[in-house]
Amino acid sequence: MAVERTLSIIKPDAVAQNAIGEILARFERSGLRVVAARMVRLSTEQAESFYAVHKERPFFNDLVGFMTSGPVMVQVLEGEDAIRKNREIMGATNPKEAAAGTLRHDFAESIDANAVHGSDSPETAENEIEFFFKADEICSR
């Protein structure tokens, strides 16, 4: 398997729970490495741009409102099969359907406030990483 990178966002609900450390520890325990990270407060424009793929969906405005409601922690994760591994750690989008021990099962409040975001494909990962980080801000290790 190839080493991949994926974008991960710890959303405002999980940040408010002081869950950042535990979430990052779970990534690292699974073999993923954090190679870039920062805390940001997204503007409405940034959130609309980042989630533009969902612009026509009925939940778009609520998503933008939620993602701008507090700070988020964004990080680039690197490792073997990182995209799939991160999505397994996150669990199902709906926390009621997420397996025990997944991030969404343990930290999400609802399908809307679902604790974490992760890229769903190599192409998406590349675009999402470039949205938040310049190449020289990513430090492979």
Swiss-Prot record:
EC number in record: 2.7.4.6
SMART domains in the record: NDK
Compartments in which it is found: Cytoplasm
Gene Ontology CC terms: cytoplasm
Catalytic function, reaction form: a 2'-deoxyribonucleoside 5'-diphosphate + ATP = a 2'-deoxyribonucleoside 5'-triphosphate + ADP; a ribonucleoside 5'-diphosphate + ATP = a ribonucleoside 5'-triphosphate + ADP
Required co-factors: Mg(2+)
Taxonomic superkingdom: Bacteria
The protein's enzyme class: transferase
Subunit relationships: Homotetramer.
Stated family: Belongs to the NDK family.
PANTHER family: NUCLEOSIDE DIPHOSPHATE KINASE (PTHR46161), NUCLEOSIDE DIPHOSPHATE KINASE DDB_G0292928-RELATED (PTHR46161:SF3)
Physiological role: Major role in the synthesis of nucleoside triphosphates other than ATP. The ATP gamma phosphate is transferred to the NDP beta phosphate via a ping-pong mechanism, using a phosphorylated active-site intermediate.
Protein name stated in the entry: Nucleoside diphosphate kinase
Source organism per UniProt: Halorhodospira halophila (strain DSM 244 / SL1) (Ectothiorhodospira halophila (strain DSM 244 / SL1))
